[in-house]
Structures are given as C-alpha cells and as structure tokens.
Design a protein with these regions (language model features):
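Ferredoxin-type iron-sulfur electron-transfer modules in oxidoreductases and energy-metabolism complexes
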Residues: 346-362, 372, 376-429
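Acidic low-complexity segments
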Residues: 82-140, 149-151, 207, 224
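Flanking helices and flexible, charged tails adjoining ferredoxin-like Fe-S electron-transfer domains
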Residues: 99-119, 123, 131, 136, ...
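Short histidine-centered loop motifs in beta-beta connectors
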Residues: 40-49, 53
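Short hydrophobic beta/alpha edge segments that flank linear recognition/processing sites
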Residues: 50-64, 79, 90-97
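Conserved hydrophobic positions within beta-strands
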Residues: 73-75
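N-terminal, Lys/Arg-enriched amphipathic/low-complexity engagement segments
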Residues: 1-43, 94
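Hydrophobic alpha-helical positions that pack around
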Residues: 195-306, 312-319, 327
Length: 429
C-alpha cells in the first residue's frame, strides 16, 4: 500500500471567491484538437462568418469531440499556436468577434420531464455533438466513456468531487453554486448507465460545498455523499475508486469492466447544460491563483488568450516566472501567455519572479525510496527514470511506465529534486 501524500492545498482564498463571468475575447483562438483521440479538421475557412456555439472543427472518428465557436464573428486565420493540452503547437482557428452575440441553435434543449423517454442514443449523440470531454484533466470524450457495452453492467457511479489539485477550486465553486445542475447531470448519466448507485465523493475541507451536496443529493434514491480526508492522489479516478470501493482496476482492465464509472464534477455540469439548455461546451470555470492579489474563479470562454485574463486582472506580465495551466501537479508550464484557454484549463496559476525563492538544486539519487513508497499505483519511479535517462525504453516498459497516472508525487517527495515525473510523462507521450 502506498503512503499517500498530503500536499498543502493553497485554496483558502480561492474557495471563497464566487464564480465571475469573464468578458468575451475580442479575438478567440480555438484549438481544433483538445481531447484524447483522433484530431479534428476545420469545418470553416478564413472569411467565413460564425455564430456562438457553431461547430467549427470535427472528426469522423469515434474517439473524438468537436469544438465550437465561443463568439460570433468572422474567421480571420487558421494556423498553429501553443496547445497546453499536449505541451506543443497545434492547429487553431482565429475568430474576430462582431459584438452581435448571434447564437447557433443546432442543439435543441430537452426538457427534464422528457428525459426518461428520450432514447439513450439520442443523449449520447447530444453529449458528443456538444463536444464534452473529461474536464478533470483527462480529456477523454465523454460520449465514448458513457457508451458502455450492454454486457458490462455498471453498479456504481462515483461523482469525483475531490478536486485534489493544489490551488484549484473551480469544481468546488460548481458544487456550491451549481448543485442543482449537477444533480440534473447525474440524472442523465444514471439513465445512460442503467440507474446505478451514486456515490458523491468529496473532501471534508470543502466546508461550504459538503452541506450543499448533502442537501441536494441526500434526497435522491440510491445516492450517498461521502466526505473524507482524501489526499491529493485520491483525486485521481482509479485511486479514488479504491478509496471508496476498496478495490482497484487491474492494469489490463478499464473501470467500466469492474462495474464502475467515475465522472468529474465539471463534466457533469457540462452534460446538464448540453442536454437541458442546448449549450455546447464553449466555456468553463477556471481558477486564477498563485502569486495574485485576489484569487478568482472565472467563467471563461474557451479560446480566450491567457494574456487577456492576466492583463485584465492587473497581473504584471513582466514579472512572470511561470504560468501553469491545468493544475500545479499535473498541469503544463506554458511557453507563451498567448496560448488560449482550452476545455482542460481547470486553473491558471501565476508565479512571479519577485516572489521566487530558489530551492535546492538537483543532486544524485540518495536511494531513500520516497518515490517508491509514495507512488499511488506502486511503480518504481526512480528505476523507470534511470532506464529512460539511459535510453532503455524496453526496461522502462517492463517497469510498467505506461501505468503511471502522471500525478507528480514522485518529484514532489524527492529530496534530490530529480525530474522524475517530467521525464516519465515525456516518455509516455
């Protein structure tokens, strides 16, 4: 059993900050490829006019998710820009807003009273056409995840309300402010999965969210809210499943094969919006935190340049040492602040030069085994790292490098400050 590590949350101010609507960008930069799976191709050309919510890129492959225009206006450019989802440059569509806020009406809202008589394939298609992917960081297309084979009955739906990443509070604010909408989203998922038991798993430190979840979900049949002292790593779906149900998914199996589906809070919120409001995924809540005077939770249009958010929040861009997108432990230190917000941008963490305190420099491994004892999936990170440094990829594979969940704990606990997680993640990609 791994020694699960408690990491300082750094959420004191941000968790108290209500969700604010951030202004639409004058120019949106929408990456065509933001999910795990097949890449999309543009459906528009330079000079085309687009409306809010119009599908602008898609793929014919099953494991994919379209992207939509977050604003109305005109396509001015199609080219490459830095993509924080994959830490590399990829294709994007530039849209200059016209200020008209004209909406596309392709997705017709389904009334809550009609949910139970709506065919599952219609709901799956809606989730797919809305471009919904895992918003907890994984980025896997939700329509594929919820298309469970009929011979694999789902017994338990776990609502992942743990939000283990330090600094991140976007999910926590959704739990507080959009609790009823989360329940609506859960009802959609339960219908698709054959009405399994629901366990809402959250942390006791979310003192405002826990009673809200208990109040709203406590009225539902076969539904339980569990609040525990979860560690950071237990925010991962596979580790959370073990903490709640007492068993883990073998390396050669998926969660659904064990009768369980784990779904993130933000994803559930997006499902409710798509089904009942006819809204594609064109915005998300993201936490602005770190070396900032006032941490915030912002409802931001996908495609908003991160520089816009920094400037409009009076952050000195000349004092930036590092901007991390998508979580301190598992996110990406972006190469340019002109990179746009994506579906997977759960947070924007700002770290300044002026507040930087140099830490210990990298030294040789001291054979303490901290990384091994703290790995939540029982790997040997330092041995994998040493194999990769030597270019011995066969050995790394034999050490189960592909089972790494990229939690970053090994680097966090390493007294020698070896780049364990970064090296392993780079090799996996």
């Amino acid at each position: 059993m791994a020694n699960l590590v408690n990491i300082k949350e750094h959420k004191e101010q941000a968790r108290k900050a209500p969700i604010e609507v951030f202004p639409d960008p004058k120019i949106a930069v929408v990456l065509t490829y933001q999910h795990v799976g097949a890449a999309n191709s543009p459906l528009v050309s330079v000079g085309d006019s687009v409306t809010i919510g119009q599908k602008i890129a898609d793929s014919k492959e099953r494991v994919s998710a379209p992207v939509h225009s977050p604003i109305s206006g005109k396509v001015t450019k199609i080219g490459d820009i830095y993509n924080s989802c994959f830490a590399e440059c990829s294709e994007a569509i530039w849209i200059e807003g016209d200020g008209k806020k004209t909406k596309d009406k392709s997705l017709t809202p389904i009334s809550e009273s009609d949910l139970q008589k709506t065919a599952n394939d219609v709901l799956i298609k809606r989730i797919r056409e809305a471009g919904i992917i895992g918003l907890g960081g994984a980025g896997f297309p939700t329509s594929v995840k919820l298309s469970v084979p009929q011979d694999k009955p789902i017994r338990t739906l776990i609502v992942n309300a743990a939000e283990g990443e330090p600094y991140d509070t976007a999910d926590e604010r959704l739990m507080i402010e959009k609790t009823e909408n989360l329940l609506r989203g859960v009802k959609v998922i339960r219908k698709l999965l054959g009405n399994p038991k629901v366990i809402v798993a959250t942390k006791v430190s979310k003192v405002e969210a826990v009673p809200k979840l208990q109040e709203v979900f406590g009225k539902e049949p076969e539904t339980e809210v569990i609040a525990k002292h979860f560690t950071y790593q237990q925010g991962d779906a596979s580790v959370l499943q073990k903490a709640i149900l007492g068993y883990e998914v073998p390396p050669d199996k998926r969660s659904y094969e064990m009768g369980t589906i784990v779904q993130n809070v933000a994803t559930i919120n997006a499902i409710a919006n798509a089904v009942f409001e006819g809204e594609p995924l064109i915005s998300r809540v993201t936490t602005l935190n770190g070396d900032v005077a006032q941490p915030k939770n912002l409802l931001v249009k996908i495609g908003t340049p991160i520089s816009n958010i920094l400037v409009q929040n009076n952050i000195d861009t000349n004092d930036l040492r590092q901007v991390v997108v998508g979580g301190m432990m598992m996110g990406d230190s972006i190469r340019t602040i002109e990179a746009p917000v994506t579906k997977r941008t759960s947070s924007i963490l700002v770290f300044s030069k002026s507040k930087y305190k140099p830490g210990q420099k990298e030294t040789a491994c001291i054979h303490c085994s901290n990384c091994i004892s703290s790995c939540p999936v029982r790997l040997h990170p330092v041995l994998i790292y040493q194999a990769l440094v030597k270019g011995d990829f066969d050995k790394a594979e034999k050490l189960w490098v592909k089972d790494c969940i990229a939690c970053g704990t090994c680097s966090y606990v390493c007294p020698s400050k070896l780049p364990l997680a970064g090296t392993i993640c780079a090799a996996r990609h």
